[in-house]
Design a protein with these regions (language model features):
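C-terminal catalytic and target-recognition region of SAM-dependent MTase-like enzymes
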Residues: 46, 73, 87-149
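Conserved SAM-binding motif I beta-strand of class I
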Residues: 1-4
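Helix-to-beta-strand junctions that scaffold the AdoMet/dcAdoMet cofactor pocket
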Residues: 22, 82-84
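S-adenosyl-L-methionine
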Residues: 8-51
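Short, contiguous acidic/charged loop-to-helix segments that flank catalytic cores in large enzymes
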Residues: 20, 61-69, 93-98
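Mobile active-site "lid"/loop adjacent to the S-adenosyl-L-methionine
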Residues: 47-77
Length: 149
C-alpha cells in the first residue's frame, strides 16, 4: 500500500505499477500518512516492513522544531506498525536535519514507542547527489533501515 497526500504522485505511482506489470499487487491511495498510520495503529495492524519517505517538513531554521516533531511522530507511528523482528525503512530529505540529529530523532521515536531497534544500514546520498563540503545544503539525504523488536 502506497500513500501520498499528492494526487499527482499517486497517479504517477499507479502508472509506474501498470508499466511494470504489477498493478494487481501494488495499491496506492491519496491520504495523509499521519492520519492513516494513526488509524492503522488503533486497528492493531502490523506489517513485516514499513517504509517512510516523508517530505522535508522544513525549509528554514526557524521551523526546525516542527521538522523534528514531524520526523519523530511519523517514525513513532511507523514503528508501532512493525511486527516484532520486522523492519522500518525511513528517510529524510532536508539539510537542516543533519545525519546525527536524524538518528537522535529515530532513537527518541523508538523510546516513545517502547520499541528496541537495531540499525541495519544507514546511508547518505549517493554519488549522483554530490556533497560539496563548502556548501552546507548539499548534504540532505539520509536513509535508514532498522530492525524493530
Amino acid at each position: 500500500m502506497g500513500l501520498d497526500i499528492s494526487a499527482n504522485a499517486v497517479q504517477q505511482a499507479i502508472q509506474n505499477a501498470e508499466l511494470n506489470g504489477v498493478q494487481n499487487i501494488c495499491h496506492f491511495e491519496v491520504a495523509n500518512a499521519f492520519d492513516v498510520l494513526k488509524q492503522w495503529g488503533k486497528e492493531g495492524r502490523h506489517y513485516d516492513v514499513v517504509m517512510l519517505d516523508p517530505p522535508a517538513f522544513t525549509k528554514s531554521r526557524e521551523t526546525i522544531q516542527k521538522a523534528i516533531t514531524g520526523y519523530k511522530e511519523i517514525n513513532l507511528r511507523g514503528m508501532k506498525l512493525v511486527k516484532q523482528g520486522g523492519f522500518l525503512v525511513t528517510s529524510s530529505c532536508t539539510n537542516l536535519v543533519n545525519p546525527e540529529l536524524f538518528l537522535q530523532i529515530i532513537d527518541m521515536a523508538a523510546k516513545d514507542a517502547r520499541r528496541k531497534i537495531r540499525q541495519v544500514i544507514f546511508q547518505t546520498q549517493s554519488a549522483d547527489h554530490p556533497v560539496i563540503r563548502s556548501i552546507e545544503n548539499t548534504q540532505y539525504l539520509k536513509f535508514l533501515i532498522i530492525q524493530v523488536q
